């Protein structure tokens, strides 16, 4: 008999060799019906996996991220099977699950069209209805290569040949289709209830522009049609809110072919950016942070010392200065560490909180670039805190509360993930355990719910990630808290303790916005360009009905500017309805309309973007109203 520990801590005994699917049935027939995959001792596996030793077990459903992943991974295989049935000459490349669904890359001597996608989708529905079992099998290297050669799958042969010696080579078979794959997958094609093919794109083999251009088909999959319909509605809404479209319409930013991935901020975009950064500075000053600034370019040796060279070299830009090798920083932490090292520190100085709005550069593949969301140059709102081990819990709690304050201001709900040690980590087991427990205890102490994301920590320490949920249900990973014992060791950081001896500080890396540019992109989509008054680039649009009101309009404009209200005037010889419609398209919070009545009464006719016509009020009353709205940062 073997002992199986369930997620809730309950221990059950079973015969050795029992399949996970059978355990799911014994736990609950309802769970068995919903089960898609499982985790055994933290590793995601198929439900058909047999258990031969004591293990911890978590049954995964579509509510779990890895459950979704398994279902959508199978969706990619179903797509490939459908394409091969309809177009046997097509060659298969790769087909993974991704955050929002899946894709598969194909080599074909024709171009896929939207009409062909409809035909493929119909074939997918047939395959789902046929309910083929997914059967995993393994082959020795030579047999695996021969199998793929027989099928004329050159890309699969290349993948197998590139696998390290001794690597397990596994395949999945479903009906008449077999694919090279490590898995895991759901038990049968019938589990994938609803599939939709979404779009077509080009993609270089292995992401290398020197390789052949393939055709990529994107799709998504759900266990219920209602969930798929909801997702498709969200996509339609997302198109309307696309920050690239709104950024152009509202004249906030642009991206040019002279600098792909390097955004240009226009005056209105800079207003939003400066407000966000100034608010950030104010709140950090209140919370005891001191702001620093470090150079963009630093000697290559620094990046070797920090470990970024080994883990991040492919994403870095390099230059040569005075015959020396330098790198443009992809992260702010090594520069911040040099600031810490510049002075001797006492335990009385700790915790030391150093903040930086630092510009970083990271090389992203051109195909991955996406407006402000994925760029090559961005401002990271970093802070690095140095503390004793005894101060970890209190400092982490303080950071969590600060992050919570920021996100609530913008109306975001969010969830928290604790990410643990990855495979390519550095440091001792003991340090990782202390660091992970420190983050866990901080979250537990304030009753903050969180998920555990095994193996997704930074290479130097575990982390807490904050995922924002926007108004149409999408999630965005922004804030992060990373506990680090490794950098202080690598850079020989120290402080003088109460005993007069040198001690090693603990370092925490953290961000709130994550990337200022990306956060602005998220806000554009969150508000659909209709920013709250305190954040709007133009807060008031002032317009006259005829030239007779021009002098009064200029007086009103001057009064608004004296009160630091951002105002634009529209004195064009156009109908007032046209001016109002244009201001509404520009999503200005307030329009002040001035006609003869308003001039005579010394008032302004107020129209709100949100509430429509508010009637005529005195200018003083309006100024008081909008100033209060700005002060309290009404969302």
From Swiss-Prot:
InterPro entries the record matches: aa-tRNA-synt_IIb, aa-tRNA-synth_II, aa-tRNA-synth_II/BPL/LPL, Anticodon-bd, Anticodon-bd_dom_sf, Beta-grasp_dom_sf, TGS, TGS-like
The TGS domain is annotated at 1-61
- Binding residues for Zn(2+): 333, 384, 509
Q: How is the cofactor bound?
A: Binds 1 zinc ion per subunit.
Q: Which reaction does it catalyse?
A: tRNA(Thr) + L-threonine + ATP = L-threonyl-tRNA(Thr) + AMP + diphosphate + H(+)
What EC designation does it have?
A: 6.1.1.3
What GO cellular component term, any one, is given?
Answer: cytoplasm
- PROSITE patterns, sorted: AA_TRNA_LIGASE_II, TGS
What are the names of the required cofactors? Answer: Zn(2+)
| Localisation per UniProt entry | Cytoplasm
The entry's keywords: Aminoacyl-tRNA synthetase, ATP-binding, Cytoplasm, Ligase, Metal-binding, Nucleotide-binding, Protein biosynthesis, RNA-binding, tRNA-binding, Zinc
- Entry-linked SUPFAM superfamilies: Class II aaRS ABD-related (SSF52954), Class II aaRS and biotin synthetases (SSF55681), TGS-like (SSF81271), ThrRS/AlaRS common domain (SSF55186)
Q: Which leading EC class covers this enzyme?
A: ligase
One Gene Ontology MF term: threonine-tRNA ligase activity
Q: List the disulfide bonds.
A: none
Family annotation (HAMAP family)? Thr_tRNA_synth
- Family affiliation: Belongs to the class-II aminoacyl-tRNA synthetase family.
Q: How does it assemble?
A: Homodimer.
- Report the protein's function: Catalyzes the attachment of threonine to tRNA(Thr) in a two-step reaction: L-threonine is first activated by ATP to form Thr-AMP and then transferred to the acceptor end of tRNA(Thr). Also edits incorrectly charged L-seryl-tRNA(Thr).
Supply the name of the protein: Threonine--tRNA ligase
Instruction: Provide the gene name from the record.
Output: thrS
